[in-house]
Amino acid sequence: MPDPFKLCILFGDSPDRPPQQISPGWEMAEVPVGIQLDPFQSNANWAAKRAEIASWNLPPIKASSHFLHHYGLVATGPGVDWEQLEFWTKRAFERLHVLDVTTVGVYGGFFRVREGFSRVEAMDQALRFCNMLADHARLYGITVALEPMGDLDTLWPRYLDGLAFARELGRSEVRLMADMNYFLKLPQPLEDIAKAPEYCVHCHIAGDHGQPGVGDMEAIYLRLFRILKDIGYEGGVSAACPWVSTVGGMLDFGLETSKTLRYLRDLRDRVYSE
């Protein structure tokens, strides 16, 4: 039997969720690039941020998200600035490498077909940007995980659309992320993940307007976990989600991350003992 997938948590994406309050026991962490690494910040500022991140005593930081963030950064459409994207991407991968990140999530919402803009040209831009990502990823042995996100005005809204795009791109550094909630959004069968197991390198999960365990979604988690077990997936399954208090009052992030970890661990143990 393959090793189980790893339980991962996104950190540092909102001020009401202090990373230092994350409960122990999570097996890996996911860093939001544009928020915590901000490639437009000076290297001196980055050194201070690295020290701050180290002080949080997080699990190994192996994944990332929020690759483009603010500053007018776009990957498709009339507003693309290639010089800006090149600087951002180069420095982002340098900083991700320092943290020992191995999987870089890239959101499908960055690849919209803007109103009045040629879809063919947008696709050419997307291919150019993803080749740029792959070039920098190759330098550090990093894998890029494209995240189809269910919006029909994007170039690859569905997981299988993303798979076709990644295959057309033809770069071994570029694979896919499976986000459970975006599968549900259109909807799409989770079994699509198993059509090309080697392409799935990261997963996102959430609850019903909150963290996993909020709402009645246990059957869906179990279905996803069984698929991941069957394909031998050993990457991260990341709680990348809004967080709410399940006990009333202000959010106690330490309490909720501990509760969610126990919930997910119990479900995973159930699946891997079958």
Task: Name every feature range the model reports, one short phrase each.
Residues 140-157:
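Hydrophobic, aromatic-enriched interface-forming segments
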Residues 113-115, 153, 184-186:
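Short, solvent-exposed loop/turn segments at secondary-structure junctions
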Residues 1-27, 57, 83-86, 90, ...:
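Histidine-acidic metal/acid-base catalytic patches
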Residues 33, 150, 180-182, 243:
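Short, glycine/acidic-enriched loop or turn micro-motifs at the edges of active sites
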Residues 62, 74, 172, 176-180:
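A broad helix-preferring feature
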Residues 27, 31-127, 211, 233-234, ...:
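Structural motif corresponding to the early beta-alpha repeats
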Residues 45-56, 126-137, 192-195, 223-228:
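Catalytic-core regions built around general acid/base machinery
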Residues 31, 106, 146, 178-180, ...:
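Conserved beta-strand positions
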